């Protein structure tokens, strides 16, 4: 899999509190649910454009070139997209929206390059007292933007170097050549740091770091690249006040507008989330020598600024959920709206996400 992870001091603190409470008799833990979002938070990182079913992998071929073999990518760039929550408004800790800075990095530490799915220790240093990541030898700065068109040329020397070591056992190429029988699959860690422009560098609420893994396929001469993984595409989010009654589709936010969907404050809102047909692909795992076909499993993660969900995650076999704005962490009395986020993901790392503005009515 290629699931996104987060690196924050807050998560470390939460884990410590959980361990402490389990060791004490009668400890009453009041830790917030993972679904509650009241501060800056990365909810999803998507490799691929925001178009439905966009390609989520990088692919390259080794071809004869003027100076020998050359590594040629099938596309000149890959879009990287960040789905970030930063709640503001009446009753919130931050009243007005603040500009955010998005910084993308490639982890090039040896543990990440030669131990697939591992994050090198040098790529884990993001706390206020840690060295500037822009100067880290384990990190390569790629560019900025909530949507960033990453040139695949930025991957060429990294992928080429790893490929040479895997095939020959050394940078000089003097080792025994071990030609694979199928295209080579590499997992490259991509890291996003998002921070408030002009925010407090010592306040962890003003920044967040997320990690995802870019699967890169490389075909040697005579090999055929596999069909690329594509991102799933969320369908309508159906909602209604009755569990078994009629439900209508909530209108999602777009880059141009964020319509308000009226819901009753303090009432259960029953929800059904899912994806469009074709979102769950069939595939062969990269490490499967038996070439067994399997179908992706889609899971849905739910988030909101207030209240609580019945379930933090759902799937296509049990797509139902419900939310109430006033349970556990009620919306502030001054707040006239809440935000709901839905993130869909499959085990190979493809993702899609939507946000919905809810107008709280009495």
Predicted regions span which residues?
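Contiguous beta-strand segments within globular domains
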Residues: 58-91, 250-287
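Conserved structural position at the C-terminal beta-strand
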Residues: 194-196, 342-346
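Bacterial Sec-dependent N-terminal signal peptides
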Residues: 22-55, 353-355
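Bacterial N-terminal signal peptides that target proteins for export
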Residues: 3-17
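Short beta-strand elements
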Residues: 186-193, 198-255, 351-362
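Solvent-exposed loop segments of extracellular immunoglobulin-like
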Residues: 95-103, 296-301
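Low-complexity "stalk/linker" and mucin-like segments enriched in Ser/Thr/Pro/Ala/Gly
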Residues: 52-64, 109-162, 293-322
